């Protein structure tokens, strides 16, 4: 049976929009929500840990923590074309 499951992780991440006409051109941050949706067949193998599941929620959460949260939470992400911010961050 094909089904979908969804998990998310939230981060607090800083950035700026260098050429924006508003205050967004200044360094600031947001609360971001990253969502992963997985679609596939339910595991029908008898006796395995994931039996009756598409994937264990805890496994998805571990992946999201490792690949997203631990990378960008309380971090500052910089647009590669933002030479001014990149130069400033080189001195930190």
Enumerate the predicted regions with their spans.
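Charge-rich, low-complexity N-terminal segments
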Residues: 1-92
């Amino acid at each position: 049976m094909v089904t979908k499951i969804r998990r998310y992780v939230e981060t607090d991440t800083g950035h700026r929009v260098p050429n924006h006409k508003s205050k967004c051109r200044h360094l600031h941050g947001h609360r971001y929500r990253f969502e992963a949706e997985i679609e596939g067949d339910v595991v029908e193998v008898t006796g395995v840990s994931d039996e009756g599941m598409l994937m264990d929620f805890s496994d998805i959460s571990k992946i999201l923590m490792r690949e997203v949260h631990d990378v960008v939470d309380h971090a500052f992400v910089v647009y590669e074309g933002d030479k001014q911010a990149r130069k400033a961050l080189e001195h930190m």
